[in-house]
């Protein structure tokens, strides 16, 4: 049985990194959701511009709140496993 895996990408003010991060996750073949955690830069707009699957939190909830939003998304859409890769691109998704 193949598990359905979701990569949760919490992002706060990551407009310069988010496209590259999402691309690296996509290149590995994983589904993803970016959680824009109340960014004050244009992270959300960059996500929309690049047709990135994103949830926009109206205020900054911190890493815990952003990841929790991702867990809820995973449950809602029937994922078996979810993992976190930070929006700054410092986690290598090939290790998932």
Predicted regions and their residues:
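Acidic helix N-cap motif at the loop->helix transition within catalytic regions
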Residues: 16-20, 41-49, 94
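Cell-envelope/extracellular polymer assembly enzymes that use nucleotide-activated donors
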Residues: 4-6
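A short, conserved beta-strand element in the Rossmann-like catalytic core
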Residues: 38, 62, 90
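Residue-level signature of catalytic and energy-coupling elements of molecular machines
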Residues: 18, 70, 88
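Short, well-formed alpha-helical segments that are part of the catalytic scaffolds
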Residues: 12-27
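Short beta-strand-to-loop acidic/aromatic patch adjacent to the donor-nucleotide binding site
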Residues: 79-90
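Conserved donor nucleotide-binding strand/loop of the catalytic core
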Residues: 33, 44-77
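Conserved sequence signature across two-component system core domains
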Residues: 11, 35-37, 57
């Amino acid at each position: 049985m193949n598990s359905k895996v979701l990569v949760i990408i919490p992002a706060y003010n990551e407009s310069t990194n988010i496209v590259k991060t999402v691309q690296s996750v996509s290149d590995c073949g994983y589904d993803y959701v970016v959680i824009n955690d109340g960014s004050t830069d244009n992270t959300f707009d960059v996500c929309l511009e690049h047709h990135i699957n994103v949830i926009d939190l109206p205020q900054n909830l911190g890493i815990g709140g952003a990841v929790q939003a991702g867990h809820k998304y995973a449950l809602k859409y029937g994922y078996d496993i979810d993992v976190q890769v930070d929006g700054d691109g410092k986690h290598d998704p090939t290790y998932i």
